[in-house]
Amino acid sequence: MHIDITHYLIVSALIFTIGIAGIFLNRKNVIIILMSIELILLSVNLNFVAFSAFFQDLVGQIFALFILTVAAAEAAIGLAILVVFFRNCGSIAVEDVNVMKG
C-alpha cells in the first residue's frame, strides 16, 4: 500500500476537525481550549510538511519548525498565565476571566 498526499490531508483534516470541535463543544475549560488550539496548529503543520514533501521543497518544513516554536512559546505562556490566574482566583473557568479587568 502506497501512502500519498491524500492520506496526510485526510488525517490533517480529521485533526483540525477534532480541534475545532474541542473549542466549540467545551467552552468552559481554558486548558481544553488551549489543547484544541494546539491540535489545530498541529494539523496545519502536517499540511505544510505533506505539501513540502510532495513538491520536494524545504520551505514548508522550515515554516513548520517556526510554527512549532511559536506554538511551544504560546503554550508555555498560556499555561503560566493560567497558573497565576488559578492562584489568584481558585478557578480556571472561562466565565471567571472577566475578573481580570481593572
Swiss-Prot record:
GO annotation, biological process: ATP synthesis coupled electron transport
Membrane topology: Multi-pass membrane protein
Subcellular location: Cell inner membrane
Enzyme class, broadest EC rank: translocase
Pfam families cross-referenced by the UniProt entry: Oxidored_q2 (PF00420)
Stretch forming the signal peptide: none
Reactions performed catalytically: a quinone + NADH + 5 H(+)(in) = a quinol + NAD(+) + 4 H(+)(out)
Annotated family: Belongs to the complex I subunit 4L family.
The protein's name in its UniProt record: NADH-quinone oxidoreductase subunit K
Taxonomic placement: Bacteria, Pseudomonadati, Pseudomonadota, Alphaproteobacteria, Hyphomicrobiales
